[in-house]
């Protein structure tokens, strides 16, 4: 199974894995876990605004050793955003949903607002 980790799932997996719960941690360990470059962009912006107390470079440096692979943002992902309804206004989340749909990957999130897009 391929999973695209939502940004908060990535941060919890790296900094506070217990917050994910045993079943979610096990699912991540048994799957090909992907991290979108868009998540790094989101973390960098929010850290720069003081909304996150984290060094974006540390997150980037922890991705590969944690067994996660990076998913680049492709033009097809950006275009897929157009097809999404207005369920969620956050541009980072919308891009993650579009990537999951385009790549036929399950988006792993605890964000209830994203569930309005249905299974990805």
Language-model segment annotations:
Residues 1-35, 49-61, 103, 112-116:
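Short, well-structured N-terminal submotif of metal-dependent ribonuclease cores
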Residues 43:
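Phosphate/NTP-binding elements of NTP-utilizing enzymes
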Residues 118-120:
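Active-site regions of enzymes building and remodeling cell-envelope glycoconjugates
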Residues 55-60, 65-115:
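Active-site neighborhoods of divalent-metal-dependent phosphate/nucleic-acid chemistry enzymes
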């Amino acid at each position: 199974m391929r999973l695209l980790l939502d940004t908060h799932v990535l941060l919890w997996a790296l900094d506070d894995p217990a917050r994910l719960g045993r079943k979610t941690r096990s699912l991540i360990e048994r799957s090909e876990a992907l991290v979108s470059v868009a998540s790094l962009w989101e973390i960098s912006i929010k850290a720069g605004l003081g909304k996150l107390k984290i060094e974006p470079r540390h997150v980037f440096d922890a991705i590969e050793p944690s067994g996660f692979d990076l998913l680049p943002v492709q033009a097809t992902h950006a275009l897929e955003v157009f097809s999404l309804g207005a369920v969620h206004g956050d541009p980072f989340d919308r891009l993650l949903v579009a990537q999951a749909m385009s790549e036929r990957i399950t988006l792993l999130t605890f964000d209830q607002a994203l569930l309005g897009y249905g299974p990805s």
